[in-house]
Curated annotation (Swiss-Prot):
Species annotation: Dictyostelium discoideum (Social amoeba)
Principal localisation: cytoplasm
Enzyme Commission number, as recorded: 5.2.1.8
Name of the protein this chain belongs to: Peptidyl-prolyl cis-trans isomerase cypE
Name of encoding gene: cypE
Protein family according to the UniProt entry: Belongs to the cyclophilin-type PPIase family.
Amino acid sequence: MTEQTVTLQTTVGDITLELYYNHAPKACKNFYELSKRGYYDNTIFHRLIKDFMIQGGDPLGNGRGGESIYGKKFEDEITKELKHTGAGILSMANSGVNSNGSQFFITFGPTPWLDGKHTIFGRVKSGMKVVQKMNAMQTNNDKPIDEIRIIKATAN
């Protein structure tokens, strides 16, 4: 399979994400297809915790919404090879075991306590300066004060 990426055009700048199909095929297919369908277009990053992560992918914008392409929550794809070792890791947000939908997060630094709990399915290929800029933004109750929006998600 040729490398597939997704570019998030955000109000802060562009981030291109490389997807790890060999390690997490279901999560990658879900993210890629949702991006292709315009599912993430005009959604916000609803959660930002400095030096931890930024979370998006919820069409409701409050952390409670989102569906997968599979019509329901899908199972985790945890591998021992992939760990949350630094900034720029792309991982599925969930509410417990096997509860993946459409929400995802990008790490701002090492988050080893998430290993074995969240499916890693990619990394930032380009746009780390944009991710760093997001990390520096002010928040109120873990929500960015100045809204960070995905204008368009493009499946490449």
